[in-house]
Amino acid sequence: MFSGRFTVCLFFVLSGFVLSLRYLGVVAAGNPDLGASIAKRTFRLAGLLLTTATLGYVLMCADLFFNNEVAAVTGSSPWFSYMWATDLSLGAFLHILVFDAFSKTDVLNPPLWTIGYELYGSFLTFGLLLFFRKTRLRFIAYAAALVLLQGSYYQCFVLGLFLADIYQNVSGAREWLSRPAVGASFLIAGLLLAGSPAYLPPEALDQSAYGFLPQLDMLGGGYSTLGAVLVLLGTIGSAWLHRFLTRPAIAFLGTISFALYSSHMLVQGSFTSWLFLLLLERVGYDGSALLATMASLVVMFPAAWLLWRWVDVPAIRLSSWVGVQFLARVQSKSKA
């Protein structure tokens, strides 16, 4: 079993890595391209955030969330019952959407708490690249950022940047990571740490398989982040994993992953919960849980595809246009 926090940490570490790659190495893109990436980042993330937050508000107003009733049956309080617990007026909703979209929309759609980290973590990554990527002091800057941000999820982005720098600039790093024994060792160790529980009382944690591990409070995300780093190290040099991850079905999941992540909890809190309660007295707890889960997958994937097609793709096009306009403005000023 993987901890849910592990997937979040992997997402953040991978973001720092991927966002940095093209700005490091021998043929790195220049500062104008980096500026364009900064300019368009907000637009890239805003489409699905604003849309799914609005969907969450509509479902709240229509009283179509059944998470409280499900939490009482399953014992998943307070986690599940705390969701959508805020009674928002239309004015308060619009205020959040206009002024606090990247900090408070999680009251409308809980997974959106990560998107604020993603935006500002991206800016942190781009800022470090802008000021330090061409200097020999950049690794000192990375270390300083890790110290200043200790205990924060923003460390994940710095770690991703650090790994990208090593991968692009350190001689022999790619060859070493491509060795099957090295990659497999990192991957196995990372997957073992991926199960480290995020939220357990100390006495329960001590009795788990991870109870012998010392506290890792200085690292945001703890062992979930460490596991994410190791999984990335075990993946980037693996030829067979690259072939697997580029298969059509896996590539499709990657294409709709942002839309799926942004919408899955809305489905679970509404349709899944409603269907579970409807079936509970008819087929029992286990049967209703299984059938509701299977039916939810039938809803989630088409919904994610629709959001990708009609929201995410236009957001990508808009952000690309913003980047092109930024570069055109820079070029026109340089010629003046």
Language-model features and meaning:
Residues 1, 46-119, 123, 230:
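Membrane-interface helix-loop-helix regions
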Residues 24-32, 166-180, 237-251, 272, ...:
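Membrane-interface junctions at the ends of membrane-embedded or membrane-associated helices
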Residues 1-8, 104-117, 145-159, 175-184, ...:
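Interfacial loop-to-helix transition and helix-capping segments at the boundaries
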Residues 20-28, 59-62, 128-137, 162-172, ...:
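Structural signal for the C-terminal ends of transmembrane alpha-helices
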Residues 116-146, 166-178:
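Solvent-exposed interhelical
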Residues 189-313, 335:
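Alpha-helical transmembrane segments of multi-pass integral membrane proteins
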Residues 7-41, 48-68, 161-167, 267, ...:
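Juxtamembrane transmembrane-helix termini
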